[in-house]
Amino acid sequence: MGNGTSRVVGCFVPSNDKNGVDLEFLEPLDEGLGHSFCYVRPSIFESPDITPSNSERFTIDSSTIDSETLTGSFRNDIVDDPSFLNRHNSKGLAETTFKAISGASVSANVSTARTGNQMALCSSDVLEPAASFESTSSFASIPLQPLPRGGSGPLNGFMSGPLERGFASGPLDRNNGFMSGPIEKGVMSGPLDVSDRSNFSAPLSFRRKKPRFQRFMRSVSGPMKSTLARTFSRRSGGLSWMHRFFLHPETRVSWAVGKDGKLHGEDPESCLESNRNLQWAHGKAGEDRVHVVLSEEQGWLFIGIYDGFSGPDAPDFVMSHLYKAIDKELEGLLWDYEEPSEDNQLQPDQEPPTEENMCDPESISEQHSKSVVAESEEVMIDDISSLGNTDTQIADGPPGDSAGPGKKSMRLYELLQLEQWEGEEIGLKRYGGNVALNNMTNQVENPSTSGGGAGNDPCTTDRSALDGIPNSGQRHGTKKSQISSKIRRMYQKQKSLRKKLFPWSYDWHREEGICVEEKIVESSGPIRRRWSGTVDHDAVLRAMARALESTEEAYMDMVEKSLDINPELALMGSCVLVMLMKDQDVYVMNVGDSRAILAQERLHDRHSNPGFGNDEGIGHKSRSRESLVRIELDRISEESPIHNQATPISVSNKNRDVTSYRLKMRAVQLSSDHSTSVEEEIWRIRSEHPEDDQSILKDRVKGQLKVTRAFGAGFLKKPNFNEALLEMFQVEYIGTDPYITCEPCTVHHRLTSSDRFMVLSSDGLYEYFSNEEVVAHVTWFIENVPEGDPAQYLIAELLSRAATKNGMEFHDLLDIPQGDRRKYHDDVSVMVVSLEGRIWRSSGQYYPERKQKFNR
């Protein structure tokens, strides 16, 4: 219905089973367990605001394309409008290799505030959830919710059915209240849409709330909503605007400054172009952090999984800095930046007035001399009004979020100030038009007097003229000013809460002035373009390693400065797993024991699709696009085990199929494990510390860490960091050489036709799965539930295995509070990147025997 829901509905499994669980959310979803989210890549030629046709999600052999009508193909590069195709091809847009991203995280550790975030430590008004998620609107997410006891889903213990997830996640609006995405040159990192609804998957609330608090909130919010609605009904256009403000306080109203100096609603097309450049997602589960950034136009994908230990500071720091460091290092290797063309820049007479030229006498004389020549008093008054509007914007403060040159996002209290100024504007037109006109005319006729002293300052003259104008609504404006100050305080409190929930978005950048300058430069800065030369893959890997090195140096400097106040920072560290995909090139960098697994189809098992090239395929040429979609949907419905009651999914069938997939698929580990489980790592540490016979103690580095390489963990890298700790946390540090390093392993891989998907995860997944089991289970799940969420399925399987291993039921494990549950499983974050999209016709494309099996 225009909100992009159909784009992600394929991530969710429709449940038509009579035994399915009906979702009746009588209480808010609990976000403390974890999140499941997905991103389905749309066609780069479609508008993000237009619902994509289902036909663009299939792939049919190119022989079925009708070259005259451009129909009969489900490839993404075929569209119905040839002019639209040519128009977008002129921009040189790239076709990315990845098609869909599935992610899920589950927390086992309790949530702890970052040590450097003293405001969060002192705040006790909101309980920080152990898991949270935020993203642009292209991602759909929902908190993990276990099925009620006694309920049984088709595959796992979560209420994951895509229908349910689509319902629970709400409208997939194109906005977000947080501009916390990674900063990028020429591209705004946060959503820039004009819609005013929150993009969270579920409210940040919890199951167990005190009834008295709910009654208090209802008693307070009701009168305030009604009062503010009556006050601003003229501007807001009705109660619904205020209703959305209270339900979604993070949202902002976007405005743009036109050439006339007045505020106008932001152009949806301009927002569309800016928002399509970058999509991002941030997630946390316990001490795990997940960072996803992708660009549809440039054809690249960045995924970072940061598995922290001993505290959240290290993974939060990596979340805030590593992507930006990599982006900087890769300039000139994978992409480059070009300055905006002079044709797109404003002419000198079209430049918006600034704080300097507004007070420049010659500038004002030049502006208003045109109005005198036109001999129009109305034009003169409107010009003065537009000048006042611009002045008011600058006086209000720097723009909150720049969407481009001259654009700003306005919060509610800023709208109140704007309305108060409009009241003064009305008084200007009624009473002070002649006074202001005479003053400005005198300045034009006598330019020599405009530069004399402060008494003749044109800006002072304008302001004094405005102040002397009687305003019939002065008392009304005073009331609105009081309400504006109250709402400003409300906004500041909400911002402090968001700082606690998402510390990586705020706490490392405290100087607002610097951030504002960065945003202004960002909006008018250079534009990223594709690197046209030959890519040096070794240079790319070295650049990624340099980015990690510089990020750790900055973190260690920060820790060293804080040792006297927060010595526990020396204990905190993180494993780092980064995957950068650019077209068909995949670059992987890791330190620690998080893994990146590539699933490849064994060549001797590959089969061509039996539907390709036969009579049925030839018949497709003469059929319309819509009929082809219906044929494919009917075929999927018949072959899917979810809809085919004759082939129910049973445990025995699943185990047999998973075993067969282990023979047909191969797991290739692109990352390297850095832990004491690897003999080479143990030998390396002992050879570097021959004088210390206890460098490896109890299968851990100095008896403390299982990992042999990590980001942070300064107490095992510098003796002074170790000495700053309490004695109970110190180790016997011999010498000055570090026991662990942050030297990463880097790998480049060129994707081939046999590569199917990638699985990136923290080490918690491999406590219960081997690499081959992960690939086999994901392949089985995609084969049987092509619209499902494989990452969430892996999380459910892991929790089920953890419960079985410890002799308890699935729900009994989840009933164990976080912190205590860490005894049974670790924080786990999983990302599954499909390299060919959702496998709608996988039964025919991969294993033809599956089709005959379903038809029995």
Curated annotation (Swiss-Prot):
Binds 2 magnesium or manganese ions per subunit. Belongs to the PP2C family. Gene3D superfamilies: PPM-type phosphatase domain. This is Protein phosphatase 2C 32. The keyword Nucleotide-binding does not apply. Insensitive to okadaic acid. Keywords: Developmental protein, Hydrolase, Magnesium, Manganese, Metal-binding, Nucleus, Phosphoprotein, Protein phosphatase. Residues 340-373, 388-407, 446-485 are annotated as: Disordered. One of its GO terms (cellular component) is plasma membrane. Residues 471-485 have a biased composition (Polar residues). Disruption phenotype: Loss-of-function mutant pol-6 (T-DNA insertion) shows suppression of clavata mutant phenotypes. The catalytic activity of POL may be functionally replaced by the activity of PLL1. Pol and pll1 double mutant is seedling lethal. Mn(2+) 1 binds at D307, G308. Residues 395-407 have a biased composition (Low complexity). GO terms for biological process: maintenance of meristem identity; regulation of DNA-templated transcription. Residues 269-835 form the PPM-type phosphatase domain. Involved in the regulation of pedicel length and of CLAVATA pathways controlling stem cell identity at shoot and flower meristems. Its cofactor is Mg(2+); Mn(2+). One of its GO terms (molecular function) is protein serine/threonine phosphatase activity.
